[in-house]
Amino acid sequence: EVFGMDGSCRSDFDHRSVAHEVLKRVRLGRRIAKVHTGRMQVLFTHRGIMPLLMALQSALNGKTALEGASPLAGRIGQQVLDPRVCICDDPTVDWALGSCPIDGEGVQSRRTPLIEAGIVKGFYYDLQTAGRAGTSTTGNGFRRTGAGDYFEGQPTPALTNAMVAPGSESLDDMITSMDEGIIVDQVMGAGQGNILTGDFSVNVHLGFKVEKGKIVGRIKDTLVAGNAIETLNDVAAIGNRAERDF
């Protein structure tokens, strides 16, 4: 199963490009390639990297840090990731699905730097969590939005549009530079992990084998495991194209 998606508050976004990308991945997956167990280069697409970003999302939650359950608690100002990694939350992006003028507590929305040049700049907070931590809210207080529970419970820290700054390498150049490795494009669910340590373990739903800089086929029955913080501190390159995921 291969899927693609995009989203915007505008009605005129380019849906044809989504279909084109899906068809391209279908063609690449016609051959099956074998992959051996072991450590190797891994190229995560914007879809495949979600388990790592979810671990970071938990680690950067002010409530998680306040409770001492975050591996980044007490590490503001410290280098924890590769210097090329920059992450922010920005609810002011035009037409993005998570954009909003205020959060669920009436606080004006604003861009919040979380990781800059691999350094922890801060956490995201709601009013209550910020008060307990002795700091100011970042305008990230939201209630749950599941079916039937829009106004149940208190607001809690939540991200709006989490964004990873693009790097300098094209996807083709990154693939060409790989001697042997895999591309993780889609994963099955969020996998399993431990937010206390940043560990993750996830089954690859759609992935490809790379040999001598070329995609040689689709991989099956493959699991990728590691630690999100260690992985993002051992980066070979970051793609230069910003993509949206949900």
Regions found by a protein language model. Give the residues of each.
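N-terminal small-residue-enriched
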Residues: E1-F246
